[in-house]
C-alpha cells in the first residue's frame, strides 16, 4: 500500500511523483480547501476571535476523494509550500483528514529536485502551530477590517467598494506621492559646461565652485551669461587631479521583492506575471535530458542566505566558463535590508542546479519562464563572481575665478559585469572615461555652453519602486506584494499610466476618508508594527488572539466614532472631465468607472443617459485600410487593445502598441511587440529593435 503525499498543484505533484516512485501516490489539493465564509463575518469576536472555517465552494468532491485516498493509504504526508500559506493548507488538510498535527506528517521542499525531495522526505516534522497561527491571525485581521469597513464605505462613498488593511496603506503611499507632485514648485537653474581639449581628445567639465570653493549654481539666464562673460579669454588648466581605484561588488541573489522589482525594470513584467512564471519554475518543467524538475528554489523568501553547496557549484561553473580569476576569492554574505528580520530559513532565490545554463534550458522552455530563469541564473552566478575593478579619476579645472569638475573611470577588470548588472529605476549620473591628464596641464576650450534646467518633482511609483517602498517600510510580506498591487488596481483605487501608478479620483476620495476617520489603519508605522507583531506570533513570542484583540479594540472604537462623525454625510467622488460632448443632448461628458473599467457618461445624468465607449487616439494610422486612426480601446474584460476607428468597415485590431516611429520601408505605423518594432502592413515585413533610450 502506497503512502499518500499531498501538494497544492498538479504540476508540483507530477514533478515530486517522478522522484518518489511507486511507493508513493502524489496528489494535489488545488490550493486552499477551507476558508472563512464569503457571505458572513465568520469570526466569533466574543469568543477569542474563533474562525468559522467552511469548505470552499466546489471543493466538496475533491475533499471526498482526498479522504478516501487517505483512508486507504499507508500514511499521509503533507508537502505544501514552505511558508505561512503552505502551513495553513497543511493544517486544514490535517484537520479534515483526521491527522494528528503533532505527529511528523509535514514535509517541505526548498527546491523540487531529486536531492531537494530526498532531503525533505528525510526530515518529516509536526505542523508548525506558530507558523499557522501567524497566517490565521493575518487572515482574521484582514477579514475584520474588510468586512467591517466595507459597508461603511458603501454608505459614505459608493456601493461595491471594499477596503483592506495592507492595501489601504499602499493606496496612501501612492496618493501621498501624487500630493507631493501636485504641490511641487520647480526651481530654475543653469548648468554651465565646458568642453575641453587635451591633445587629440576632449571631455566635458561642469561649473562647480568659485575660486574659494563656494558652490555655484546659476539660478537665471542672466547669472549664467555673467559667468560666461567672466570666462572670456580665461586659461583653462588642471588645478587638481585625483586618481584612485575602486571595486564594484555584485548585488546578491534575488529575494521575492528584488525579483519583482528587477523583472519590472528589465523585463516589463507585473509582479503577478513574475510570480506566475516563478511558480512554474519552482514546481517543475520538463527539461530535455533531465526530465521534469524544479529549476529554482522557493520563490517567496526574504532571506539572502545561499547554501555552501550552491556556492561551490557556482564557483565550479565560473572557473570553467570564465577562468579562476573571475571567482570571488572569499565567501560573500549579505544582510537583509528590509525593515523586519528574514521571515524564515529559506535560501535566496537561485537556480536549483547552478550548472544548468539558460542556453541549455532555452531548448525546453520559452516565453516568460525562460526570460525569468535567465535573469535568476545570471544574477545568482554574478553574486559569486569577482568584483569589477576600476581606475577612477576626478579633475578640477581652473578658469579665471571659477572651478569646473569632471570625473570618470576605466574598467581594469570586468569581473561579474561580464555576466550581469542590475537595472536601475532612475537615470543615474553618467561617468565617462577621461583622457590622460597631468597636474597643471593647460587645456583648450572647444565649447562653453549654458543650459536651462528645472528641479523635478518626485516620480510616481512604478510597481518596482512601490514594492521597494513597501519592503523598506516593513509593509506586507514576500507573498503579499503582488496581490496588494493587483487588488488596488482591480478595485479602481489606482491605475497604470505609462507603467506608473496613479491614484484615481475614487482612490483619492477613499484615501482622504480613511486618513480622516481611520488614521491608524493607513499609518505606515502602525502597519509595520503589526507586521512585527505577526512575526512574533510566528516565532512563538506572542499569542495570536491577543495580537488580534489589541488591534480590533482600537479599530472597533474608530469605526464607531467614524459612524458618528459621518452621520448624514457622504463623500462625493468628483467626475473626471473629458473633451467629449454627448450626442443626445450636447452636454459635456465625464469619465466614470464601471464594472469593466472607464466609460463616458453624460454630465446631465439622470435626465440624460447618454454613454460612449472611452477611446484614446494613438496618433497612428491603420495599416490595413490606410485611412482610419488607430484608437486605444478596452475589451469587455478590461484588457487594452488597438483598433481602426472605421470599424466595422475596417476590422483591423491588435494587442500590440502603436508607436510614433514610422516604417522605414513603407511609412506605415509601427507596432511594438516585446523588444522589437514591426510593420503590420500586408506584404511589408519590416522589423527593427526597439531604439535604446539615451
Predicted regions and their residues:
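C-terminal or mid-to-C-terminal helical accessory/interaction module adjacent to the motor/catalytic core
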Residues: 112-194, 243-244
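Short acidic, hydrophobic short linear motifs in intrinsically disordered regions
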Residues: 238-241, 250-263, 290-299, 457-469
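Short, hydrophobic-biased segments on the C-terminal half of alpha helices
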Residues: 275-279, 485-486
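A short, conserved structural fragment
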Residues: 282-297, 491-500
